[in-house]
Amino acid sequence: MSTFRLTAMTAFMVSSLFLVGCATENSRAVQVAKVDSAIGTFNGVRYPVSIGKFDNRSSFMRGVFSDGVDRLGSQAKTTLISHLQQSQRFSVLDRDNMSEISQEAKLQGKTQTIRGASYVVTGDISEFGRKEVGDQQLFGLLGRGKTQVAYAKITLNVVNSLTSEVVYSARGAGEYELSNREVLGFGGTASYDATLNGKVLDLAMREAVNRLVEAKDAGQWGQEVAR
C-alpha cells in the first residue's frame, strides 16, 4: 500500500471519529399550558360529569381517502377530559374503560361502586383547517418566507343526565402560526409541522373549558343539581 493511500485512509478514519465524537443529544421539559382555573385552590363542590360523544365535524381529515377513523375527535376528547379534571370544578368519570376497571375490581375481590354523572359533556370540532402563506422578495432572489397557520373551533354542550336538557353551551377557538424566513440563502423554510394540529386543538379546548367554568362559577348553570 502506498504512503499516499495510507495517509488518506488514516485522515478519513480520524475525521470520522471526530464527527462521531461531536454528536450531541439535547432534551428539555416543555411547560404544558393549563386552564385558568387550574391555578390556585378550589374548595367548592366538584360536579360529577362524564364525557359523551365528541366528533370531528370539520372537513379536515374526512375526505374520500380517509380511513374513517376519527383521530382528531379522539384526541380532542382526551384533551377535554384532562382540562375538565384540572379545572378543579368537576369530578370526571371514565366511561371508556369500564371493562378494564371492572376486571381490576374483580382481581381485588371487591364490588364496584360506580358513581352516576349529574351531567354529560358532549361536543365537536366544528371548524379545523390548515393553510400556508408565502411571500418572496425580488422573485425570491433576496429572500422568501412561509407561514403555516392552523385554526380550530370547539363546541361544548352540557347535558343534564336526568332530563336530557342542554343546560349550557360554550365555544372556544384558537389559531397557531409557525413562520420561517430565508434571506439571501441564509435560514430556511420549515416543512409541514404536524404538531400544530395538537397545539391549536389544545388552545381551542382550553378556551371552551374556561368559558364553561366561568359560567358555572357565575351560577349560569349547575344550580339545578347543586348539593
Q: Language-model segments: what does each one mean?
A:
Residues 1-11:
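Bacterial N-terminal signal peptides that target proteins for export
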Residues 22-92, 97-104, 178, 184-227:
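A structural "domain/chain start" motif
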Residues 38-40, 111, 143-146:
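A generic local secondary-structure boundary/capping motif
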Residues 44-49, 75, 79, 85-87, ...:
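Extracytoplasmic
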Residues 72-73, 85-139:
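Short, solvent-exposed, polar/charged sequence segments at loop or secondary-structure edges
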Residues 122-187:
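Amphipathic beta-strand/beta-sheet edge segments enriched in Tyr/Trp
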